[in-house]
C-alpha cells in the first residue's frame, strides 16, 4: 500500500495504486482482480460512505468507482453513495435523495464532497453479483483510463459540534425506523 493514500482506514484491500478503478462491495463475496486500486465492503450509509469518499479521493489515479452486489437492506448504502456523487448534500448534511435510514455526512466538508463528485465516475452495478459481468466492466474501465485528477486530496475529519435542540441535523436517538429500514419519524 502506498503510504500517502487511504488515510481514513477501514476494511479494504489495496492492489495497484496507479489503477483508475476502485470497487465497492455490497453484501457479496466477490473479489476483483489485483488490477484495481482498492476494494472493500460498504455497510453503512453514513460513516461507511464517508470513509469511501475520503479514501478514494486521496488517490487521484482512481477515476471509476464501481459499486456491485446486493444492496444492504435498511441502510441502502450503495444507493446513498450513488446519490452523494450525483446530488451532494443539503444544508443539514443529508445526502440528497438518498434512500438510506440515516444518510448524513457529518465528518467531511463540502470541498471533499465536491472533489468526490468531480473526480469519480460511478458505475452503478447494484444488484449485480455475477463475477464475469463485473470483471468485464472493470476491464472496460481499465482499457479506457481517465487522466490522473491532479494532486492527492487528504480530507480532514470535521470536529463534531454540539447539537442544539432546534438543530435539524440527524439526532440519531430521535429517528424512528420501521422494520424495512424506512424512516417513519424524525425528532423535531
What name fits each language-model region?
Residues 2-96, 172-188:
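Conserved mixed alpha/beta catalytic, RNA-binding, or beta-rich assembly cores of soluble enzyme
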Residues 16, 34, 90, 97, ...:
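Acidic-enriched, low-complexity/disordered segments with a strong bias for Aspartate over Glutamate
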Residues 22, 37, 54, 98-101, ...:
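A sequence-composition feature that detects small, non-aromatic residues
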Residues 46-52, 101-106, 131-135, 139:
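Well-ordered, non-membrane alpha-helical segments in soluble/globular domains
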Residues 53, 82, 114-117, 135-139:
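Generic detector of well-ordered alpha-helical segments enriched in charged/polar residues
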Residues 69-130:
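Long, charge-dense
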Residues 132, 136-188:
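Charge-patterned, long linear interaction tracts outside catalytic cores
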Amino acid at each position: 500500500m502506498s503510504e500517502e493514500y487511504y488515510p481514513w482506514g477501514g476494511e479494504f484491500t489495496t492492489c495497484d495504486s496507479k489503477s483508475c478503478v476502485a470497487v465497492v462491495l455490497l453484501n457479496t463475496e466477490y473479489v476483483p482482480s489485483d488490477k484495481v486500486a482498492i476494494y472493500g465492503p460498504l455497510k453503512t450509509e453514513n460513516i461507511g460512505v464517508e470513509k469511501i469518499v475520503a479514501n478514494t479521493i486521496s488517490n487521484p489515479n482512481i477515476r471509476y468507482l464501481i459499486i456491485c452486489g446486493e444492496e444492504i437492506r435498511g441502510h441502502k448504502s450503495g444507493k446513498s453513495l450513488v446519490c452523494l456523487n450525483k446530488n451532494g448534500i443539503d444544508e443539514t448534511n443529508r445526502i440528497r435523495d438518498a434512500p438510506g435510514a440515516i444518510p448524513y455526512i457529518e465528518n467531511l466538508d463540502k470541498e471533499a464532497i465536491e472533489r468526490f463528485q468531480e473526480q469519480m465516475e460511478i458505475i452503478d452495478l447494484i444488484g449485480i453479483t455475477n463475477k464475469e459481468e463485473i470483471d468485464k466492466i472493470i476491464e472496460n474501465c481499465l482499457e479506457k483510463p481517465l487522466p490522473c485528477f491532479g494532486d492527492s486530496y487528504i480530507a480532514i475529519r470535521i470536529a463534531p459540534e454540539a447539537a442544539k435542540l432546534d438543530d435539524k441535523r440527524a439526532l440519531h436517538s430521535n429517528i424512528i425506523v420501521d422494520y424495512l429500514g424506512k424512516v417513519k419519524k424524525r425528532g423535531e
